[in-house]
């Protein structure tokens, strides 16, 4: 699903919309799981920096931003029906159908999921436009996977390792590297070490 937005904030703050969208997807996924599974059956769900939604260790959604003139296209893909098992960025894909009671029976319809997603996206987008990245960052960190854990980050041809220490106000991963320096990671593929 792609949504065209015309943010009223400066362009250098548009990065935050990937965090906004991932929070919206996460909330809808959790809501769907809570409706159909007992609390004991609900697998771990969370956010993987910078923009993936993870359920039971698998990637259920990713977010892509694209600037188009004075607008921003927010693309969100969510796996509802079963997906082909391929290793993508060190995370195996997963779909709601993989953890749904009775398999794919009574899965949410894409239209219903999209409607719920657009509602949550509007909520978080409004909050961002009114209050900035701070509240988005705080909520994202509450749901972050690998925070405080030792990770490896593939940045182009280089691999950095250290502890995922924090999320910068510019959306960067703050990595306390093995030499004790804080690195500001702007892009990369994150993998938990020792797992």
Regions found by a protein language model. Give the residues of each.
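Structural signature of FAD isoalloxazine-binding scaffolds in flavoprotein oxidoreductases
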Residues: 1-4
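Long, positively charged amphipathic alpha-helical accessory segments at protein N-termini or as interdomain linkers
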Residues: 9-11, 15-45, 55-195
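A cytosolic small-molecule/anion-sensing beta-strand core signal
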Residues: 49
């Amino acid at each position: 699903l792609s949504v065209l937005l015309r943010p009223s904030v400066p362009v250098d703050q548009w990065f935050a919309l990937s965090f906004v969208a991932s929070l919206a997807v996460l909330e809808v996924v959790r809501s769907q799981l809570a409706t159909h599974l007992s609390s004991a059956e609900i697998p771990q769900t969370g956010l993987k920096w910078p923009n993936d939604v993870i359920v039971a260790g698998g990637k259920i959604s990713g977010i892509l931003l694209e600037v188009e003139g004075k607008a921003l296209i927010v693309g969100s893909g969510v796996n509802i029906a079963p997906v082909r098992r391929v290793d993508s960025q060190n995370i195996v894909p997963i779909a709601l159908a993989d953890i749904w009671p009775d398999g794919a029976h009574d899965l949410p319809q894409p239209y219903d999921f999209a409607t719920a997603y657009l509602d949550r996206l509007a909520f978080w987008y409004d909050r961002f436009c009114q209050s900035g990245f701070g509240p988005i960052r705080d909520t994202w960190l509450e749901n972050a996977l690998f925070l405080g854990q030792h990770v490896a980050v593939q940045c182009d041809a280089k691999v950095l390792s250290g502890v995922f220490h924090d999320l910068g106000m510019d959306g960067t991963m703050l990595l306390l590297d093995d030499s004790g320096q804080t690195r500001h990671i702007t892009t990369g593929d994150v993998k938990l070490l020792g797992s």
